């Protein structure tokens, strides 16, 4: 493997441009309650740890977490991810467990936890994919929420200078340890720092990024350094004072995207900042939606030269993550207790958590998620998710979406306005959110389709109206399926693509 590096706004692996396609390994080394269906009452590692101690006792809880880390993500997962044609994973880490803080704030690795990072790196090297180190939970918390294991729901990384000093030393130690490892794709310095209700801390973010970069560069000149915007990695105004000269130091900017319009227009602030700084963009987190949204969004990133990392790879009993595991028998007793119900006896609670560990070891995969992300058949492509267009007719009022496109996008029920993409549980778009593509005579759109094995495919277009459609499969040469209207007017809902036996 070769070190990843940037050049003139493009990400390279050696001499070849590369688009990152990856999976976010959330829930492993920094568990989140919602991935266990605990939600807000037990939503972060420190509260989950307290629950285990409370219900099962100290000795059991300590052994549980050792078994959990050994089972949640294994070599089998990395092999499967690589086998799907993906090239990277992003590992969410918790500083509270990765490091021990001694007297006078001396920092050293916690070897038992570090072993899991090293194991993941070894698996990634074996299967030829990159590992990105993601500081998901920084000292004191950079977000002040469940996602950073915050103690007090305040981003204390920015209220206590001591926490910043400790973080600088942590990244320095990581860079020393992994500086000669080309399979480490880069260092993601802070996950989703500073939500907008704490924006008064925003002026501290760029100076901290600069300080962290200097500390890393003192010991590691080769690895990419990745900087996220504020407010769930969506506010790039924090980079207004960042210069192209600074950004030329193998820097990548990262944004996250959830539950919003999957169109180019929504990415404009990120693209504009990246162009000004002449750096690549990475969509480092996005997902937790439905197949339609995935089929719109992720191919769009690639069309724009933006790499991506899906979140989250594995969760309990969901239809919209690539890997899932069953809820163990008796789990409702745990969630009922969190809601104020009866406390399970220690022996009963231990048995339930033992079954939980068995469940995470015997999950199942959902390859349809990967097919949606990569546009591989069999799959269904929403008509509005076209990647190329040649539209002769004028745009009409309809869905306020893909605003700079010339094509008309209509709601099937005839209303106008913005689309609602909030499908947290993976449910399909409701009837009032069905979007149709209106094609008139002479209109032409192209949908990217990936067919690496050159399988024979069948394309069925679901449409309404009296117009005549022509479909041309040029995936072998152009990677596109072209749909055109040769006469009349027709409303297209989707392309259903199957593999012929």
Language model segments and positions:
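Short, solvent-exposed turn/loop segments enriched in Gly/Ser/Thr/Pro and often Arg
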Residues: 92-95, 135-143, 190-193, 229-231, ...
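Extracytoplasmic
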Residues: 362-501
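Aromatic-rich peripheral "rim/lid" segments of glycoside hydrolase catalytic domains that contact
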Residues: 294-387, 392-394, 398-400, 404-406
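An active-site-proximal structural segment forming one wall of the substrate-binding cleft
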Residues: 4, 60-89, 97-99, 103-141, ...
């Amino acid at each position: 493997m070769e070190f990843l590096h940037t050049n003139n706004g493009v990400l390279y692996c050696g001499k070849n441009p590369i688009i990152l396609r990856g999976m976010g390994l959330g829930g492993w080394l920094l568990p989140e309650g919602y991935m266990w269906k605990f939600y807000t009452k037990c939503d972060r590692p420190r509260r989950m740890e307290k629950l285990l101690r409370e219900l099962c006792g100290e000795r059991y809880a300590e052994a549980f977490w050792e078994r959990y880390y050994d089972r949640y993500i294994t070599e089998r997962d990395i092999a499967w991810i690589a086998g799907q044609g993906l090239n990277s994973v992003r590992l969410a880490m918790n500083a509270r467990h990765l490091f021990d803080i001694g007297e006078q704030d001396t920092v050293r690795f916690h070897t038992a936890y570090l072993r899991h990072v090293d194991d993941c790196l070894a698996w990634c090297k074996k299967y030829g994919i990159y590992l990105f180190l993601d500081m998901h939970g920084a000292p004191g918390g950079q977000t002040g929420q469940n996602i950073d294991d915050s103690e007090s729901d305040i981003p204390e990384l920015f209220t206590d200078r001591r926490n910043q000093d400790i973080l600088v030393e942590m990244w320095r130690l990581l860079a020393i340890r992994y500086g000669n490892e080309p399979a480490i794709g880069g260092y993601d310095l802070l996950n989703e720092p500073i939500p907008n209700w704490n924006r008064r801390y925003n002026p501290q973010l760029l100076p901290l990024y600069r300080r962290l970069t200097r500390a890393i560069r003192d010991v590691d000149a080769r690895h990419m350094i990745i900087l996220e915007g504020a407010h769930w990695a969506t506010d790039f105004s924090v980079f207004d004072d960042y210069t192209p000269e600074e950004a030329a130091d193998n820097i990548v900017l990262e944004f996250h995207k959830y539950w919003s319009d999957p169109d180019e227009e929504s990415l404009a602030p990120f693209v504009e900042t990246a162009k000004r700084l002449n750096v690549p963009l990475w969509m480092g987190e996005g997902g937790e939606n439905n197949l339609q949204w995935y089929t719109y969004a992720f191919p769009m990133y690639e069309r724009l030269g933006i790499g991506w990392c899906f979140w989250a790879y594995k969760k309990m009993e969901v239809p919209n993550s690539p890997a899932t595991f069953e809820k163990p028998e008796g789990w409702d007793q745990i969630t009922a207790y969190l809601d104020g119900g009866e406390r399970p006896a220690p022996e009963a609670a231990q048995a339930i958590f033992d079954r939980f560990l068995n469940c995470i070891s015997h999950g199942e995969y959902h390859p349809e998620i990967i097919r949606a992300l990569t546009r591989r058949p069999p799959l269904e492509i929403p008509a509005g998710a076209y990647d190329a267009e040649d539209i002769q007719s004028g745009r009409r009022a309809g869905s306020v979406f893909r605003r700079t496109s010339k094509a008309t996008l209509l709601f099937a029920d005839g209303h106008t306005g913005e689309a609602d993409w909030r499908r947290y549980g993976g449910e399909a778009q409701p009837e009032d959110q069905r979007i149709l593509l209106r094609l008139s005579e002479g209109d032409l759109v192209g949908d990217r389709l990936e067919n690496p094995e050159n399988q024979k495919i069948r394309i069925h277009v679901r449409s309404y109206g009296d117009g005549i459609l022509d479909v041309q499969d040029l995936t072998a040469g152009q990677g596109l399926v072209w749909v055109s209207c040769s006469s009349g007017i027709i409303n297209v809902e989707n392309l259903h693509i199957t593999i012929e036996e």
